[in-house]
Amino acid sequence: MNRCTRLLLPKAAITLAAVLGACTTTRGPASVPTAERTGQSWVVTRPIIAAQVLDTCSRPSPGREAGRVSGYWAPSRQQVDQLEARLSSLEAQVPKVLDFDRQYVGIESAGKRLIYINAFHLPDDSGVNPAREAIRVCDGGAQFWGAVFDPASNTFSELQFNGGFGGP
């Protein structure tokens, strides 16, 4: 093998591999599927975001009653697990209650530590981070709801749905 052949042979092999690789009919998936489950939950810990979550526009919430919320706190993993273990008790009022995504806000009210639930359906590709952003929707009916959970009594109260869609 002469010197010229030794230099050109590797270049020719690389070019041939690139051409053949471009002609292949086997392709990988256009996108990688994710296995996110429905009904995810996030604890909101920043007070300014917590106040925004409670500032609902088409349903009553503790944050809309002047002076009712005296402070915020972060529910523990155990308290969130306790709440989520009881969610199915709302199934009669909220069909498929476990399919809703939820934000949890710890509120202090009348000397009690309660957890406010803001429930919604978040699109998979929304780019929104419910742990750091308030999810606020006006109208929407039963697709958006809120409730209060009392960890001390293990009960829900104040279940409220958003108002209906406006217009004729």
Residues of each region from the PLM?
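C-terminal motif of bacterial Sec signal peptides marking the signal peptidase cleavage site
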Residues: 21-22
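Intrinsically disordered, low-complexity acidic regions enriched in Pro/Ser/Thr
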Residues: 27-145, 149-168
